[in-house]
Amino acid sequence: MADFKEYAKKLIEIEGGYVDHPNDAGGITMQGVTLTTFRQYCGEDKTVADLRNMSYGTWCDIMKDLYWDKCLADEIENQAVAEITVDWCVNSGTQGLRKVQEIAGTKPDGIAGPKTLAAINGANQKELFDRIMSARNQFYVNIVKKNPTQRVFMNGWMNRLGRFKFE
């Protein structure tokens, strides 16, 4: 079964530090946690300074509770498939899980449950991983086609995808 701690090591490196880019639809982020998400999780009174000073423990709690656990990733048998699935959600919200569900051949409702797990775990893991990677690549291409201001993020998105390897 997949292990959050392994993914967390990779994710913290991918996400880096504080970002406040004017073209980023997510707005202000710290290590991949948006200010909006931080406030929803930690309290509406939290400030940008609080976000910037977020502890590693709080970051892990947010990533595990809001992304890893919502994808039921502890129950995904292959670490690489779990990571690429959860990472799409970290990077793109529930539409990431809907896309993975669609690729795995189950109802794309954005809610992980027994049918989603059965479809993911029942698939050829290498083929599923490759299909998710390909779909995610195309997802980013489509974002830029629809909104050329997002081109500034393309290299980062491709570098992010490049961090995931099937094992």
Predicted regions and their residues:
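Cell-wall polysaccharide-cleaving catalytic domain and substrate-binding groove, primarily
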Residues: 1-167
